[in-house]
């Protein structure tokens, strides 16, 4: 397939930041399949992960409600067709009423709204009435609720532009830890809003996904190394592993044994090995978990202290409070996430309007 529409090349370029000719070649090689073209570019080290923000087509609002005692919280995403309507007072009232009913009833699916009523009117009818008033299609795309379990709290954050919202649930053992956990949860919510972790932990990344991402990540690092070499900059280490799930007990033991042999070869006194090894093992783990650092909340370095991962921040706070603090649930909504852009043929649209 040699005849590739310019619009498709442009869309691929926006999704990947790859060069125009690279995008065209990728589409030719994949016979115009956009998804396969993205993978082709990544495997060649010509693109980072496809940017979800560039696939967002919808407008609307993400709204978060949190209980005053932090015992529960809810999050909703409501889509409109235009940004103008998203700022409309009628639309804002619809969002507020929907958010309240989701929060009050701890709903966790958009379908469950159909059993609810607002002001004595079935929700579906209420929504249709507002669509008629506003003059645009309105969709309650997704909702979620979290209730604290035992000794625990839920906190949330919605970015001021209403495009990103986050909920985090924490558990702890001591009631005296509650205030500190409320504050920390809010701070980590803000981190997640900015850094976009896809999941809470590496345990949620499937083996096949990790292996596929490894090919792309290594190609990306090798491509960057070509430029670094030209500029005389230090090169990236090319990792053998990219996720904590790959670092089995046998892998860690083998690495520690290798480090011991290295220390012996360097003539380091055996008496100080145990002081050196923890730091070296920590660096090995950091160098071998690049995927976790990109995609998992617990594996990311904290924006407020980039020397520590979120997991290490929780460990430090646990030690400070003499408690065991854990994040047990994480939800992040970004407006329009995963909705493909509609590719418009402007000439065809004008022609249709003139008929």
UniProtKB/Swiss-Prot annotation:
Subcellular location: Cytoplasm
Gene Ontology CC terms: cytoplasm
Species, as recorded: Helicobacter hepaticus (strain ATCC 51449 / 3B1)
GO terms for MF: translation elongation factor activity
Protein's UniProt name: Elongation factor Ts
Domain of life of the source: Bacteria
Free-text function comment from the UniProt entry: Associates with the EF-Tu.GDP complex and induces the exchange of GDP to GTP. It remains bound to the aminoacyl-tRNA.EF-Tu.GTP complex up to the GTP hydrolysis stage on the ribosome.
Transport as UniProt keyword: no
């Amino acid at each position: 397939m040699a005849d590739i529409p310019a619009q498709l090349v442009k869309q691929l370029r926006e999704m990947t930041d790859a060069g125009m000719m690279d995008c065209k070649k990728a589409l030719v090689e994949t016979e115009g399949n956009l998804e396969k073209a993205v993978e082709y570019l990544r495997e060649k080290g010509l693109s980072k992960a496809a940017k979800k923000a560039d696939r967002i087509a919808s407008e609307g609002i993400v709204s978060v409600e949190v209980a005053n005692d932090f015992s529960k919280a809810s999050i909703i995403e409501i889509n409109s067709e235009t940004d103008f309507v998203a700022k409309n007072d009628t639309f804002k009232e619809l969002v507020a009423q929907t958010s309240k009913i989701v929060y009050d009833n701890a709903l966790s699916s958009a379908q469950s709204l159909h059993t609810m009523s607002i002001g004595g009117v079935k929700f579906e009818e209420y929504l249709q009435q507002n669509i008629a008033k506003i003059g645009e299609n309105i969709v309650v795309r997704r909702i979620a609720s979290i209730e604290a379990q035992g000794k625990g709290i839920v906190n949330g954050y919605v970015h001021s532009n209403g495009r990103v919202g986050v909920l985090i649930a924490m558990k702890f053992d001591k009631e005296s830890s509650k205030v500190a956990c409320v504050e920390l949860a809010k701070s980590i919510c803000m981190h997640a809003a900015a850094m976009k972790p896809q999941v809470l932990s590496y345990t949620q990344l499937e083996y096949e996904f990790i292996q596929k991402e490894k090919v792309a990540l290594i190609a990306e690092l090798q491509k960057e190394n070509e430029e670094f070499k030209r500029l005389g900059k230090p090169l990236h280490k090319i990792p053998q592993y990219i996720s904590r799930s790959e670092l089995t007990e046998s892998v860690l033991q083998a690495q520690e044994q290798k480090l011991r042999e290295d220390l012996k070869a360097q003539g380091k006194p055996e008496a100080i090995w145990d002081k050196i090894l923890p730091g070296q093992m920590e660096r090995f783990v950091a160098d071998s978990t690049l995927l976790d650092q990109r995609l998992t909340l617990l594996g990311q370095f904290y924006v407020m202290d980039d020397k520590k991962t979120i997991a290490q921040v929780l460990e430090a706070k646990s030690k400070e409070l003499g408690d065991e603090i854990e994040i047990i649930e994480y939800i992040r909504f970004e407006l329009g996430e995963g909705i493909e852009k509609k590719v418009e043929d402007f000439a065809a649209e004008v022609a249709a309007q003139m008929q």
